[in-house]
Regions:
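Heptad-repeat coiled-coil signal-transmission/dimerization helices
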Residues: 18-25, 100
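Conserved short strand/loop->alpha-helix "switch" segment adjacent to the catalytic nucleotide/phosphoryl-transfer site
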Residues: 22-46
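STAS-typified acidic loop motif
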Residues: 8-19
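Short amphipathic alpha-helical interface segments enriched in basic and hydrophobic/aromatic residues
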Residues: 30, 50-54
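Conserved beta-strand-loop-beta-strand hairpin that lines the nucleotide-binding pocket
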Residues: 1-8, 53-132
Length: 132
């Protein structure tokens, strides 16, 4: 797999933002990784960008940032301008709330940092299909 130090993208805080993020992931990773891994990463990124748009971008002109690093493993961060929330207090409902569960299931590691002005959710994924 080729190495890349870092690529930073601005994703419009609009309804098509998650699709834009999935397209970026497909363009960046499809030639390097098996389709199943790329699809997992597209799903994770789509969930995080959706959360960033819905919960973090009160003003639609403020983009969500997608920070993609490929260096032996995939490390990705999604940054928005929302205050975040405590993951242990988040409850799933029929209408939503399953995004971070998807992130947890499909990534090798993930985490979140937040302040009153910004939330960063990150994940790591090894570039192989065989994982425990």
């Amino acid at each position: 797999m080729n190495s890349r130090v870092r690529t930073l993208y601005k994703i419009a805080a609009q309804p098509d933002g998650p699709a834009q993020a999935r397209q970026i992931i497909a363009e960046e990773l499809s030639s390097w990784l098996p389709a199943g891994v790329v699809n997992d990463i597209k799903l994770i990124v789509s969930e995080l960008v959706t959360n960033g748009i819905v919960h973090g971008s009160a003003e639609r002109d403020t983009p969500v940032l997608l920070d993609l690093v490929v260096n032996g493993k995939i490390h990705c961060r999604v940054l928005d301008h929302g205050p975040g929330f405590a993951t242990h207090t988040r409850r799933q409902s029929a209408g939503g709330g399953w995004g971070l569960r998807v992130v947890e299931q499909l990534s090798d590691r993930w985490g979140m940092q937040h302040s009153p002005q910004r939330t960063v959710v990150w994940f790591e994924r090894q570039p192989c299909e065989l994982r425990e």
